[in-house]
Amino acid sequence: MASQYYVGIDVGRRQHSLAVLAADRPSTWTQIAVFPFSADAPGFIAALHYLAQAGAAPGVTRCALEATGGYYSRPIYAALRAHGYAVQWIKNPAVHDLRETVYGRRSKTDAEDARLIARLLYLQEAVGQEYAFHLVQSGDERYQYLRLLVDLRWKQVQARRRASNQLTQVLDVLFPEFRLIFRKSVTGPTALHLLRRFPTVDAIADASVEDLHQVLVGEAKSLRHQTAAPQLKQWAQETAGLQGGTGPLQLAQEWLVQTLTDLDRSVADLDQRLAAAVQPLPEAGVLATFPAMSPTRVATLLAGMGAPVTQFPTDRTLRKQWGWYVEVEQSGARYRSRLGRGGNRGTRRELYLLAMQLVQDRAADNPFRHYYRRLVQGNPTPKVPKVALGHVASKLTSVMFVCMRRGTPYDPQQLWRHMGITVSA
């Protein structure tokens, strides 16, 4: 009878490490050889040849690898699956916890991690539930593509925020009165268009009022600034900004203006791609019926799922995936609970912002705001606002899960009745 084999693979950018553990020799796991191979076609061929030499045929072998390094693990995952091997992605904390247990605070090495992953597979089968670990959803290509777009958009938005802050600082030195004209933002579309047409304070001061008005209203379409041209020209002529030695700052301003323009176009392009990617997903139409829900927010939530809602058996599993779950620590009389650190950070952020938006006084009346107030004013034990907001986000996730599983739009009246709240007409 062929022995069972467990293969652990530590993934790197250009080189992977592979360890093969035989079920009939489990005690040797700390000494088993580790085979390094390059992350390309010759390396994959060498790895498959190594598995064959070790006797690890597809029918008697389980493979696992960490879902780390962005997309670096996908090629080897696909190659092993194509050759008939059973492959799993495991979450990083499983390997981290076993490493801490076995090695303590020793330095991490690729060889040790490959052996640990193989050991985890063996313990899961030999011991059972005590060594169960969380698997990563292999996902759906549509949702994976959506996650890529959402991640790219987030990076572009962060880059724009940094460039915006830098341009604001430069303008505070060169033309501090600029913010008196553009009170909302000195890096908005109208302000950037003006700075592209008139890149220096002197250029604004020398321009005619008619030219400034044409740029602000005729070209930038900013009706808010219909009467701003005369004041803008006057401030440019009387500015308290730096007058001499402004060459480096002027160069920085021109570069930042162009950078912000390019980033705005990039974000707009990504928004169009997100709208097209979200449209065919069945859950998108359901989420869009919830209050305070924007297209970007819908895309972020679906990207955080990574798979159709049918892959989640309960709302608790969806909360875990979205990063909105509670971790409890209890020892004797000591009890501590906190929001878990796992899950998708983007969806956790969106859930928090959505819950905060729904409970505000200026928001339209909705069941979630009543739920929040009931928790804050609770009897006999009121909850602090921060904790109550967490409960609102959790309730919101549960309602979203039920609606998506049923394929029905959000119905506030039904939720009012379910929560036992009577709404006056």
What is each of the regions a protein language model found here?
Residues 1-425:
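A detector of single, family-specific signature residues
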